[in-house]
């Protein structure tokens, strides 16, 4: 799976979780960019990521995610071993 494909899938998950059409996730997207972001929606997003990409997100990874690029980096490592 390429990074572009990961961004596309992540964007779909964000749109679903935050119920926002047209939301685009980039390397610089952060919680501050999404008014609907709460601790509960974040946990729902993590669950959706786990289901979509087929791995369990570790707490240390969750805590390191500050921007979309951080998420993609973790997903890329887990999915592609990179």
PLM features: what roles do these ranges have?
Residues 2-47, 51-82:
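Phosphopantetheine-dependent thiolation modules in NRPS/PKS and related acyl-activating systems
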């Amino acid at each position: 799976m390429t990074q572009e494909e990961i961004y596309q899938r992540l964007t779909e998950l964000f749109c679903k979780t935050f119920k926002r059409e047209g939301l685009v996730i980039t390397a610089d997207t952060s919680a501050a960019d999404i008014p609907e972001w709460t601790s509960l929606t974040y946990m729902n997003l993590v669950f959706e990521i786990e289901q979509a990409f087929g791995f369990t997100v570790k707490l240390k990874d969750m805590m390191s995610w500050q921007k979309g690029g951080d998420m993609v980096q973790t997903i890329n490592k887990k999915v592609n071993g990179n």
